[in-house]
Structure formats: C-alpha cells, structure tokens
Swiss-Prot record:
Keywords, in A-Z order: Cytoplasm, Endoplasmic reticulum, mRNA processing, mRNA splicing, Nucleus, Signal
Main location: nucleus
Protein's recorded name: Cotranscriptional regulator ARB2A
Membership in a protein family: Belongs to the ARB2A family.
Subunit annotation: Interacts with AGO2. Found in a complex, composed of AGO2, CHD7 and ARB2A.
Cellular localisation: Nucleus; Cytoplasm; Endoplasmic reticulum
Biological classification of the source: Eukaryota, Metazoa, Chordata, Craniata, Vertebrata
The keyword Chloroplast belongs to this UniProt entry's keyword annotation: no
Length: 416
C-alpha cells in the first residue's frame, strides 16, 4: 500500500481534527479553523516542500554546458544536448532551471553582438537620468552615417531579447537558427548599417518594499479588554496564515514590482522611440526591416503612427510569420496599399520556400518560409530575405517597384 507525500503531510491535521471534534465549543472553533486551512491548501503547491533549492549557477560553465564550434549547446563532459527534465517529477524546478539558463544565454548573446559582430550597446532613453530605469539597443558603428543601406531587426514577443529569434532554438538546436547573428554578419558584409531593437526590455524588476503594519497604540480609546481580544484574534489569524504559508510555498520567492522604462513600456512604444531617435536620423537612403512574429505587429503600429516618414525612408520590409492584423490595428487604405507593394511575409508552411500562400487579409503578399515551425521561419527564409532586399533596392534605383506579389523560386529576375 503506497501513501502519497501530501497524505503524510496532511495526516497529523486530520488526526488532530478527529481528536478535537469530541471537545467543547473552543475545540469546535479550532476544528473550523483547521477545515478552513485544509480548504485553502493547494496540493500542487504543497509538493514544493520536497523541491531542491531554487539556486542555480550564473554561468554556462556552472551548468556544465558550452557552445561547440557548430554553435550547438552541449554538456562539457558528456557532449549531450541540453536535458530539460534534469530531475523527474519536478516540473516546476526543471522550468526554473531552464529559465535560469535562458538568462545566461541572453547575456551570452549580448556579448556575441558586441565582440563577434562589433556592435555597440546604446542606452535608452537617450536623455535618461542616472537613477531612472533604462533599456538599450545595439548598433553598428555606421548605423547612422551609412549613406546607402540600413537594416533594422525586430524579434517577437516573450522572453527573447536583442539578438535572438527564439531561445528554444538557441538551447536545443544552434546559435545560427536561434539568433540574429547570421543576419547581422551578412548585412555588414554586404554594406548595410545595422540596428538591433530590444522590444521586450520594457521594465526593470525591483524587490517590493515590505509594508509594516503599525500595532494599535496603547493610548487608544478602546477598552483594554476589547483591545486584548482583538490582539488575540489577530495573533491567531497570523499564526494560521504562517502555518499555511509554510506548506503552501516553502521556497517563497521574493515579491517583485515592475518599474517601466520611459517611452519604452511596450514593443510598440519601443519601435516608435527607436524610429524617432535613431532610424529617422540615419543617413541611409534605403532602410530595410526584418520583423518576426509580434515584431511585425510593432512595425505596422509604427507605420500607422509615422506613415509619411516610413514611406519616405523604408524601401522594403521582410516579415517572418508576422502576427499583425491590418483590420484590428485599423491600418488605413494607403498603408495597406504600401504594404502590398513593399512588404513580404514569410509564413510557416509545409510548401517549398517562396511558394505563394493565400491570404485572407488585404495586406502584404505571403510566401512559404519552407518550414511549418513558427520559430524557424526567420532562419529558413534567410537567403530569400536578402535576395528580396537586393531586388527592392535595384527596383528603386531603376524607378521600378519589385513584383513581390509573384515571388517564388520559379520566378526569374527578368520577369520583375
């Protein structure tokens, strides 16, 4: 006969209830309190009691992992890929471990952007005081001075930060598929300036200050007997609450509060801020955007807010499985027409790369990214995106519009 851990923990409470139910009014009051306690105990939370400490390394070496020459994350000793279920039946602990590794990956990618891609980290807001919350973007040295071409990269929503397309790909597959580094390196090699946005860095977290409740003053007008009775009830309530908390969350994490970054409190705000303070000031005659997933929505919002400026400065936009919606975002007719001529959305599809895919919305053309995995669409469409930008630039130079509505591998350049 097997007895669950939760049953063993609750057994003393049940026995206690059985014993005190035979007593008088005071004992019945205790029974009521214990019943209330049992009704509020979350058995899933209760199981946290047996979790190992949520104390994880802060370096890749501490996790005993490293990226090999192919950019794959491998265990230093065994050479095996990352294992999520490090401890069986401890999903929450495994998830926290994964998140801790993810934070290290984010810092590692930041280092690669600076050291491997030679980008500089630029703090925003540009006029921030020393004490206020700040974010940052990455730029090539010639981002604002390159007279010809500028490429702007925007990732999707979630835990990803500047330089990443998908954390899952970085951890489980490789750096090439999961980061923006191949785009950055090729862009620099082909003479583009580069700006890497950081649209999910919207706030900083600080520990919530503890609120100290002052006890009632002895000089209160309340009768001493009534005050003593209230204090007794308060102490008993606190005791019951502490008893419950001990089981509910033995590894209670700190309560945090969010301090939002001025003018960068959302991906949409961030895109507009970077446009106003950097992209709009850039010397480049041709600006190109690559925007993945929610990044596409942020670009459409930017266009709604800065339509004339975007039309004047942006030559072409490559979207990858964008989640924008021209109806919900209330994009006007002139914006939809511009997008049809100057944008292309590489969507998740089992069709071959660049095959036309039907669209229900009257916005930009949709073609297959050559994969049905959402997070892989940027990487799989990588060569097609650069070809699209080259064609758009040449078409602009010769005063022609690129025929993006008919893009596929079967269409030759002469037909444009």
């Amino acid at each position: 006969m097997s007895i669950s851990l939760s049953s063993l923990i609750l057994l003393p409470i049940w026995i206690n209830m059985a014993q005190i139910q035979q007593g008088g009014p005071d004992e019945k009051e205790k029974t009521t309190a214990l019943k209330d306690l049992l009704s509020r105990i979350d058995l899933d939370e209760l199981m946290k009691k047996d979790e190992p400490p949520l104390d994880f390394p802060d370096t890749l070496e501490g996790f005993e992992y490293a990226f090999n020459e192919k950019g794959q994350l491998r265990h230093i000793k065994t050479g095996e890929p990352f294992v999520f279920n490090y401890r069986e039946d401890l999903h929450r602990w495994n998830q926290k471990r994964y998140e801790a590794l993810g934070e290290i990956i984010t810092k590692y990618v930041y280092e690669l952007l600076e050291k491997d891609c030679n980008l500089k980290k630029v703090s925003i807001p540009v006029d921030a005081t020393e004490s206020e919350p700040k974010s940052f973007i990455f730029m090539s040295e010639d981002a604002l001075t390159n007279p010809q071409k500028l490429m702007v990269l925007i990732h999707g929503s979630g835990v990803v930060r500047a330089g990443q397309w998908a954390r899952r790909l970085i951890i489980n597959e490789d750096l090439d598929s999961g980061t923006q580094i191949p785009f950055i390196k090729r862009a620099v090699a082909e003479g583009y300036g580069v700006i890497v946005l950081n649209p999910n860095e919207n706030y900083i977290e600080v520990e919530k200050p503890k609120i100290h409740v002052q006890s009632s003053s002895d000089s209160s007008d309340e009768p001493a007997e009534k005050r003593e009775r209230k204090d007794k009830v308060s102490k008993e309530t606190k005791k019951r609450r502490d008893f419950y908390e001990k089981y509910r969350n033995p590894q209670r994490e700190k309560e945090m509060m969010q301090l939002y970054i001025r003018e960068n409190g959302s991906p949409e705000e961030h895109a507009i801020y970077v446009w106003d303070h950097f992209i709009a000031q850039a010397a480049a005659e041709n600006v190109f955007f690559v925007a993945h997933s929610y990044g596409g929505l942020a670009f459409v919002e930017l266009m709604i807010q800065r339509e004339a400026d975007v039309k004047n400065k942006v030559t072409a936009v490559a979207l990858t499985d964008s989640v924008h919606n021209v109806w919900h975002q209330e994009a006007g007719k002139t914006i939809r027409e511009w997008m049809r001529e100057n944008c292309c959305n590489w969507v998740s599809s089992s069709e071959p790369l660049d095959t036309s895919v039907e669209s229900m919305l009257p916005d930009c053309p949709r073609v297959s990214a050559g994969t049905d995995r959402h997070e892989l669409t940027s990487w799989k469409s990588f060569p097609s995106i650069f070809k699209f930008f080259t064609e758009a630039s040449e078409a602009k130079t010769s005063s022609l519009k690129p025929a993006v509505t008919r893009r596929s591998h079967r269409i030759k350049h002469e037909e444009l």
